[in-house]
Amino acid sequence: MNRAKVLSSYLGLLRTEKKVFQNDKRALEHVINLTRVQFRDNKNETDNTKINEMIDHANAVSHFLVKDLIQGVRKDEKTIQLKFDENTKSYQQYEFVNDQPPQRKKRGKIQIDDEQPTTCCGGGCGKPMPSNNSEKSTCS
């Protein structure tokens, strides 16, 4: 019974991958190879609970690929066309306009007031400035 479930989930996942990645040969080869390796690595598993968890995981991956995956195809340097399927969960057309970050604006020159600071060092200690230059500042 478990063998039939495992084979069914394996073949179903391979069919889903072929359907979803039909136009992306490199991605298709990668996911099929990854699926084969993972199923082959776990072929000697005898624990029924682990086998059922792995079957559920394979079915969840298959469901994710059909319902949630959206592929993008680069049309030119700034345009990517998203490929939606009729099975995709949120089939909406989005148009990204001005998705580049805005250009930084140049600031003008910083103006510094010619006033003398009213505190001793101008640094915010709050102590008054000494009346003549011979006195030392009490700031630490």
Swiss-Prot record:
InterPro entries linked to this entry: Complex1_LYR_dom, Complex1_LYR_LYRM7, MZM1/LYRM7
Gene Ontology, cellular component aspect: mitochondrial matrix
GO biological process: mitochondrial respiratory chain complex III assembly
GO molecular function: protein folding chaperone
Biased composition (Polar residues): 130-140
General function of this protein: Assembly factor required for Rieske Fe-S protein UQCRFS1 incorporation into the cytochrome b-c1 (CIII) complex. Functions as a chaperone, binding to this subunit within the mitochondrial matrix and stabilizing it prior to its translocation and insertion into the late CIII dimeric intermediate within the mitochondrial inner membrane.
Name of the molecule in the record: Complex III assembly factor LYRM7
